Amino acid sequence: MPRGLELLIAQTILQGFDAQYGRFLEVTSGAQQRFEQADWHAVQQAMKNRIHLYDHHVGLVVEQLRCITNGQSTDAAFLLRVKEHYTRLLPDYPRFEIAESFFNSVYCRLFDHRSLTPERLFIFSSQPERRFRTIPRPLAKDFHPDHGWESLLMRVISDLPLRLRWQNKSRDIHYIIRHLTETLGTDNLAESHLQVANELFYRNKAAWLVGKLITPSGTLPFLLPIHQTDDGELFIDTCLTTTAEASIVFGFARSYFMVYAPLPAALVEWLREILPGKTTAELYMAIGCQKHAKTESYREYLVYLQGCNEQFIEAPGIRGMVMLVFTLPGFDRVFKVIKDKFAPQKEMSAAHVRACYQLVKEHDRVGRMADTQEFENFVLEKRHISPALMELLLQEAAEKITDLGEQIVIRHLYIERRMVPLNIWLEQVEGQQLRDAIEEYGNAIRQLAAANIFPGDMLFKNFGVTRHGRVVFYDYDEICYMTEVNFRDIPPPRYPEDELASEPWYSVSPGDVFPEEFRHWLCADPRIGPLFEEMHADLFRADYWRALQNRIREGHVEDVYAYRRRQRFSVRYGEMLF
């Protein structure tokens, strides 16, 4: 290879990242127009397009590099010099942290995810002293109640870039003040002020104002979801001011926000104060930088692994028919490997399973489907693996494992947020907690269905409970679009003997689903059955599901709220908005 080629390659990779992030910002900047035009299908398409941008631009750079090197192989020393040149380009680069992840992605694509060592990749950042440093560019604006909170909030709302008419701005302001007074008290509120992010956060059918409520006793989140009426007028649906509420809004089971962030590290650092329970990876994920979030997630895993004496074990819960799931006992993630062979009743391929996981990545997760990070050639030290798990891995996934002596390499796996399996949770709770869990489960099914997702396998074991008590779906191998399912009523038996027969007396075609059958496995527990019948009996009716299908086919996009219905101003304060 000619000398000087290393610098050209480094510059080409960085220019490729510039192009990718420029397109990322371009798609993001269209969020306001899509919101104002109530073009909800364009919102969904833009979300998918933005996710695809990263891999598309990695592919473009890889093709450029193959042309530059004329397809010649490169030795280890050459690659190290490329990384050295790339590192020298980063000290004055504003998005250096994501540029490092882009370099990693290009390397992995070029070398088929092999030889992934700290010398060749940015396993940890090359600029640790710059990470999360305060950046001078102001991200937010302060508002003080010099003339009272009504005047303050009028200024905040008037500062918004939205061009639509407000349904009743004065009413919304009084609702917010009423909520803040109930939360803080009159005296504390008088001594508090707001800091509001310059950019709105767009997701689904809402534009979120995100701010900080700075009080004498500390800083609280200040979140206002802005929606539209059917007539295209704006209204504020609620005001959220607790870290738990904010954590759910920015949760791992929700779609990524569209927020214009030329300096994502600065925004992540600004958000950290109101989302103290979120990791760096989760914050990058929330603002749509999912590939860099994967880098940060892997770093968090390495840091945890270095500081613990634990071994990987099989994850608690009923063993899956398709996925082998393991975890570290104290770590908040699980690792999922597709088995070599599935249970006989699972008539599908590994490629189908991967396609299902990709569908979830790109689809609106409505707060009910866990996000995942996908890894190839994942290295584990054998000393970190319990003997029982090692035996299970070799028994169930041997084709995906390469033995390197003191290490194994797993060819492909997913990492996902760890939750308590719902079936285990239901065994452990009673009273109101049991009722809440069943209500949450039914709501999860409804919200998934309204978003055109049918879970397929609705058993409790395929759902998890988050630390906030939300029920989230996490087993995707049978997932499909609602519009692909044929929901049928079970025909009446022809003869009394039909109901005793081992085979159904009616024909069943691929894609047929009989909601009446859900009762058999969802209501078998006498503690659960009556609750389910009380709250979710309509889920057992085929006409309920067909009505949802009709709404989807007519192009209707349902509202998705990241908070309880009872928190809506229209419910709390009695005035209906429509």
Swiss-Prot record:
Reaction(s) this enzyme catalyzes, per UniProt: L-seryl-[isocitrate dehydrogenase] + ATP = O-phospho-L-seryl-[isocitrate dehydrogenase] + ADP + H(+)
Active site: 371
Enzyme Commission numbers on file: 2.7.11.5, 3.1.3.-
GO CC annotations on file: cytoplasm
NCBIfam families, sorted: PRK02946.1
Membership in a protein family: Belongs to the AceK family.
Name this polypeptide is given: Isocitrate dehydrogenase kinase/phosphatase
Organism the protein comes from: Escherichia coli O139:H28 (strain E24377A / ETEC)
